[in-house]
Amino acid sequence: MTRRIGFTPRARSQFLAAVEYMHAERPMAARAFRNRSMEALRNLIRFPESGRVIPEFPDLGFREVLVGKYRFFYRLQGDAVWVVGVWHDAQIPDEPA
């Protein structure tokens, strides 16, 4: 059973940048996005394979969960879900590492 969520440094930076960007214009929307994101990630603790395989990188073993217009790329490792990237859906994502 998966018991925790972790962020790589890059993913944490991307997530915080998205929240800060929203907060500058709409603080309430930023707070709601942060809360929805954390809820979606917590759901992965119970259902770690519920995210879809990333269409751009189907052979790499990464999955994604969508929150609004943002894509959270993650991988399963031991008892953890590791978020490896956070992208707006208008961005072309880098290959997860």
How does the language model describe each region?
Residues 67-97:
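Enriched for short, Lys/Arg-rich terminal
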Residues 1-62, 80, 94-96:
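Basic, Lys/Arg-enriched alpha-helical interface segments
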